[in-house]
Protein backbone atom coordinates (compact mmCIF):
# COMPACT_ATOMS: atom_id res chain seq x y z
CA UNK A 1 0.00 0.00 0.00
CA UNK A 2 2.86 2.36 0.83
CA UNK A 3 4.34 1.86 -2.64
CA UNK A 4 1.09 2.86 -4.34
CA UNK A 5 0.82 5.97 -2.15
CA UNK A 6 4.46 6.88 -2.90
CA UNK A 7 3.94 6.66 -6.67
CA UNK A 8 0.51 8.34 -6.50
CA UNK A 9 1.85 11.26 -4.44
CA UNK A 10 4.69 11.97 -6.84
CA UNK A 11 2.41 11.65 -9.88
CA UNK A 12 0.07 14.15 -8.24
CA UNK A 13 3.02 16.46 -7.47
CA UNK A 14 4.27 16.25 -11.07
CA UNK A 15 0.90 17.20 -12.54
CA UNK A 16 0.09 19.77 -9.83
CA UNK A 17 3.34 21.65 -10.49
CA UNK A 18 2.72 21.38 -14.25
CA UNK A 19 -0.77 22.87 -13.84
CA UNK A 20 0.53 25.66 -11.63
CA UNK A 21 3.29 26.53 -14.10
CA UNK A 22 0.80 26.65 -17.00
CA UNK A 23 -1.51 28.85 -14.91
CA UNK A 24 1.39 31.16 -14.03
CA UNK A 25 2.13 31.55 -17.77
CA UNK A 26 5.81 30.97 -17.13
CA UNK A 27 8.17 32.05 -19.89
CA UNK A 28 10.81 29.43 -19.11
CA UNK A 29 8.75 26.37 -20.09
CA UNK A 30 9.73 24.03 -22.90
CA UNK A 31 7.30 21.59 -24.51
CA UNK A 32 9.59 18.67 -25.31
CA UNK A 33 8.06 16.64 -28.13
CA UNK A 34 11.20 14.56 -28.60
CA UNK A 35 12.86 12.20 -26.20
CA UNK A 36 15.65 12.72 -23.74
CA UNK A 37 18.26 15.13 -25.10
CA UNK A 38 16.04 15.92 -28.10
CA UNK A 39 16.02 12.41 -29.58
CA UNK A 40 13.09 12.25 -32.01
CA UNK A 41 11.18 8.96 -31.93
CA UNK A 42 7.54 8.14 -32.76
CA UNK A 43 5.15 8.29 -29.78
CA UNK A 44 4.19 4.60 -30.12
CA UNK A 45 7.85 3.72 -29.58
CA UNK A 46 7.97 5.86 -26.42
CA UNK A 47 4.88 4.01 -25.20
CA UNK A 48 6.45 0.58 -25.86
CA UNK A 49 9.73 1.57 -24.22
CA UNK A 50 7.84 3.03 -21.25
CA UNK A 51 5.72 -0.08 -20.73
CA UNK A 52 8.76 -2.36 -21.05
CA UNK A 53 10.76 -0.24 -18.61
CA UNK A 54 7.81 -0.14 -16.22
CA UNK A 55 7.55 -3.92 -16.18
CA UNK A 56 11.30 -4.23 -15.61
CA UNK A 57 11.22 -1.72 -12.74
CA UNK A 58 8.20 -3.44 -11.19
CA UNK A 59 10.00 -6.81 -11.23
CA UNK A 60 13.11 -5.23 -9.68
CA UNK A 61 11.02 -3.49 -7.03
CA UNK A 62 9.28 -6.75 -6.09
CA UNK A 63 12.71 -8.32 -5.44
CA UNK A 64 13.67 -5.67 -2.90
CA UNK A 65 13.46 -6.54 0.77
CA UNK A 66 13.49 -3.19 2.55
CA UNK A 67 12.26 0.37 2.10
CA UNK A 68 15.88 1.58 1.81
CA UNK A 69 16.40 -0.41 -1.40
CA UNK A 70 12.77 -0.19 -2.55
CA UNK A 71 12.24 3.57 -2.83
CA UNK A 72 14.69 4.21 -5.71
CA UNK A 73 12.75 1.78 -7.92
CA UNK A 74 9.50 3.48 -6.95
CA UNK A 75 11.01 6.88 -7.81
CA UNK A 76 11.90 5.52 -11.26
CA UNK A 77 8.37 4.18 -11.74
CA UNK A 78 6.78 7.47 -10.63
CA UNK A 79 9.08 9.60 -12.79
CA UNK A 80 8.77 7.38 -15.84
CA UNK A 81 5.01 7.08 -15.48
CA UNK A 82 4.68 10.85 -15.02
CA UNK A 83 6.55 11.59 -18.24
CA UNK A 84 4.84 8.76 -20.12
CA UNK A 85 1.34 9.89 -19.10
CA UNK A 86 2.15 13.50 -19.88
CA UNK A 87 3.41 12.60 -23.37
CA UNK A 88 0.32 10.47 -24.08
CA UNK A 89 -2.18 13.00 -22.66
CA UNK A 90 -0.67 16.25 -23.94
CA UNK A 91 1.58 15.24 -26.85
CA UNK A 92 4.74 16.52 -25.19
CA UNK A 93 6.52 16.69 -21.87
CA UNK A 94 6.60 20.14 -20.33
CA UNK A 95 9.95 21.01 -18.79
CA UNK A 96 9.87 24.05 -16.52
CA UNK A 97 12.78 24.02 -14.07
CA UNK A 98 15.67 26.01 -15.51
CA UNK A 99 18.99 25.86 -13.67
CA UNK A 100 21.83 26.98 -15.88
CA UNK A 101 23.91 25.24 -17.27
CA UNK A 102 21.60 22.18 -16.98
CA UNK A 103 18.91 21.49 -19.57
CA UNK A 104 15.37 22.49 -18.55
CA UNK A 105 13.67 19.65 -16.62
CA UNK A 106 10.59 18.78 -14.54
CA UNK A 107 9.56 16.95 -11.34
CA UNK A 108 9.46 13.56 -13.11
CA UNK A 109 13.04 14.08 -14.32
CA UNK A 110 14.11 14.76 -10.72
CA UNK A 111 12.48 11.49 -9.65
CA UNK A 112 14.25 9.60 -12.45
CA UNK A 113 17.62 11.08 -11.46
CA UNK A 114 17.12 10.47 -7.74
CA UNK A 115 15.96 6.92 -8.48
CA UNK A 116 19.06 6.12 -10.55
CA UNK A 117 21.37 7.60 -7.90
CA UNK A 118 19.53 5.65 -5.18
CA UNK A 119 19.82 2.38 -7.12
CA UNK A 120 23.53 2.92 -7.75
CA UNK A 121 24.04 3.76 -4.07
CA UNK A 122 22.16 0.66 -2.87
CA UNK A 123 24.13 -1.55 -5.30
CA UNK A 124 27.34 -0.01 -3.97
CA UNK A 125 26.31 -0.70 -0.37
CA UNK A 126 25.31 -4.30 -1.19
CA UNK A 127 28.64 -4.91 -2.93
CA UNK A 128 30.54 -3.38 -0.04
CA UNK A 129 28.53 -5.51 2.41
CA UNK A 130 29.23 -8.72 0.48
CA UNK A 131 32.93 -7.82 0.16
Regions found by a protein language model. Name each.
Residues 1-131:
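Alpha-helical transmembrane bundles and membrane-interface segments of multipass inner-membrane proteins
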Amino acid sequence: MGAILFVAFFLWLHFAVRSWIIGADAVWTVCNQGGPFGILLPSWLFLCIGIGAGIFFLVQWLKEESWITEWPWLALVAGGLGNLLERQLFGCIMDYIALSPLPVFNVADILLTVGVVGILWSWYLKRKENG
